[in-house]
Amino acid sequence: MVDPKESIDIENVVASTGIGQELDLESVAMDLEGADYDPEQFPGLVYRTQDPKSAALIFRSGKIVCTGAKSTDDVHQSLRIVFDKLRDLNIQVDDDPEIVVQNIVSSADLGSSLNLNAIAIGLGLENIEYEPEQFPGLVYRLDEPDVVALLFGSGKLVVTGGKRKEDAEEAVDTIVERLSDLGLLD
């Protein structure tokens, strides 16, 4: 069997930062080429970077959320681009604002189909939500690492809530170990 950890792909990294001052988003939107700002639809200004591909949500408070990046390196690179664009508009930005990863969403494949009913019973209901009429996946809340895994009958899974790439690897290891111990993984 292929090691399921080898199948892990980061799908999205969400991080936050700030420039420590309020912004006039209407003014920034007029001067920042490619910016989208429609305060009736969303309170922040959206600025997309192409390489690496991500979206920065810039708020009046000076807080910035970066989403859509495929790695923590891409988050840092995208936000450096945003900081430089703001500096080009004569907006004061610290040399190295703190960037905090809030969430990493990863996908993986356990390599065999899963009996979600048996897993729900085997893992115990205190950490599990499984209502197939509502959602086809089984929601498994892990304590260590502190993440949520969505398991699907196909054997595919999504891990969300991680702060580091290793959180997904540890979660997959834990899931494989627990399902194997229960005899529920081929």
From Swiss-Prot:
Pfam families the record matches: TBP (PF00352)
Gene3D superfamilies for this protein: TATA-Binding Protein (3.30.310.10)
Sequence repeats: 10-86, 101-179
BP GO terms, sorted: DNA-templated transcription initiation
UniProtKB keywords: DNA-binding, Repeat, Transcription, Transcription regulation
PROSITE patterns: TFIID (PS00351)
GO molecular function, one term: DNA binding
Family: Belongs to the TBP family.
Purpose of the protein: General factor that plays a role in the activation of archaeal genes transcribed by RNA polymerase. Binds specifically to the TATA box promoter element which lies close to the position of transcription initiation.
Alphabetized HAMAP family for the sequence: TATA_bind_prot_arch
Protein's recorded name: TATA-box-binding protein
